[in-house]
Amino acid sequence: MSTEPDWMADVVFDADGLIPAIAQDAENGQILMVAWMNRESLAETAATGRAVYWSRSRKKLWRKGEESGHAQQVHELRLDCDGDVILLKVHQNGGIACHTGRASCFYRRLDGTSQRAAWVTVDPVLKDPELIYK
C-alpha cells in the first residue's frame, strides 16, 4: 500500500524520476530560478510549505536555503497542462534566489541581433556569494 498522496498520480516525471520546477516570486511574478524535483522533494514541499528540490549534481534533496538562509516559503503549487512542469509561487527569504548573490538566476539578457548578439548582465549582485556560503 502506497503512502503517496493521490494528487501525485497527475504529475508526469521523466525517465529519471524528475520534473522541472519553476520558482516564481508570489508578489511580483519575477521568475527566480528553475530546478528539479523528484517525488520525495515534491511531497515534502507540499507537506511543509518550504521549497525542497532534487540536486542532480549532489544526488540528494536540496532544501533551498539550508546553507544560505535564503529559503523559499511556498504560497502555491501549480501543475502545467501536460502535468510535466511544476510552478512554485514563493516568498524568497532575503530576496536572493541565485547562488551568484542575485535576486534571480535569470540575470543575463541577450542584447543585439544575430551574430552580434551577446549576453549582458542586467541585474546586480545583492550580496557577495563568499559571504553567503561559508
Swiss-Prot record:
Cofactor: Mg(2+); Zn(2+)
Presence of the UniProt keyword ATP-binding in the record: no
Record's subcellular location: Cytoplasm
Binding, Zn(2+): 81, 98, 105
Cofactor comment text: Binds 1 Mg(2+) ion per subunit. Binds 1 zinc ion per subunit.
Organism domain of life: Bacteria
Catalysis: reaction(s): 1-(5-phospho-beta-D-ribosyl)-5'-AMP + H2O = 1-(5-phospho-beta-D-ribosyl)-5-[(5-phospho-beta-D-ribosylamino)methylideneamino]imidazole-4-carboxamide
GO biological process, one term: L-histidine biosynthetic process
Entry similarity comment: Belongs to the PRA-CH family.
Entry binding sites for Mg(2+): 80, 82, 84
Protein function: Catalyzes the hydrolysis of the adenine ring of phosphoribosyl-AMP.
GO cellular component terms, semicolon-separated: cytoplasm
Record's protein name: Phosphoribosyl-AMP cyclohydrolase
Description of how the protein assembles with itself and partners: Homodimer.
Species for this entry: Bordetella avium (strain 197N)
EC numbers on record: 3.5.4.19
Protein's UniProt keywords contain Transmembrane: no
Alphabetized UniProt keyword annotations: Amino-acid biosynthesis, Cytoplasm, Histidine biosynthesis, Hydrolase, Magnesium, Metal-binding, Zinc
Top-tier EC class: hydrolase
Pathway entry: Amino-acid biosynthesis; L-histidine biosynthesis; L-histidine from 5-phospho-alpha-D-ribose 1-diphosphate: step 3/9
PANTHER family, sorted: HISTIDINE BIOSYNTHESIS BIFUNCTIONAL PROTEIN, HISTIDINE BIOSYNTHESIS BIFUNCTIONAL PROTEIN HIS7
Single GO MF annotation: phosphoribosyl-AMP cyclohydrolase activity
Pfam family, one: PRA-CH
InterPro entries hit by this protein: PRA-CH (IPR026660), PRib_AMP_CycHydrolase_dom (IPR002496), PRib_AMP_CycHydrolase_sf (IPR038019)
Principal localisation: cytoplasm
